[in-house]
Amino acid sequence: MTEAELIAKIHAEAGELIADACRSSSVKPEFLAALIANETGAQFSEGGLLGASHARRFEKAVLAALWEVLMGRKAAYGSIGRKDLLLYLLSGKVARDGAGEGPSTVPAAIPADSLLRLDRLASSAGLTQVMGYHVLEEASGCDSVEDLTVPARALRESIRLLAEFAQRYQLDLAAEFPPLFTCWNTGSPNGKTFDPGYVANGLRRMQLYKDLTSAVNP
């Protein structure tokens, strides 16, 4: 499948979802579409919207960092503390607004599915490959990692995270696309993307999507 065909497929299968997600945000639909192409383009080419929505990528370094928090060697990973992790791992529940206080120590025995939950927190999932641990954050609209496999919820979570990047680094969501792509891939506008062509690919795909949208809706 050519790049133009991939963008056309994303437009056909996810165009309305993308437009809905961007409606109350400064994020451009073409940026979100390019993010999907960058993150799950291969899965979208093969399995369409459903295939891309269920894509996952395990991050060993994130698992190690979460384990450090879980064992009390670090106070937190970002805004996620030990109690947040333990509550989710043991019950599958997310603590928000002070609700659902979790245990402060790791119990002697834990359910087997707790290990799967930890693995899921250390994996990216969904159309734009949001890291699972983000669902534990106070501002998240997700109740579990599995929500990231639901396209509409994954895109809303993506919009939230992009807005946080924009606020943290004083970026214009509607204009400063190269640093936003870099933030998404590395966590910082000054990071080094794993794929040297990540930003250039994103910008090119943005233009393809924008041109296609203009042609379909003149």
Segments (PLM) and residue ranges:
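Catalytic glycan-binding domains that act on GlcNAc-containing polysaccharides
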Residues: 2-217
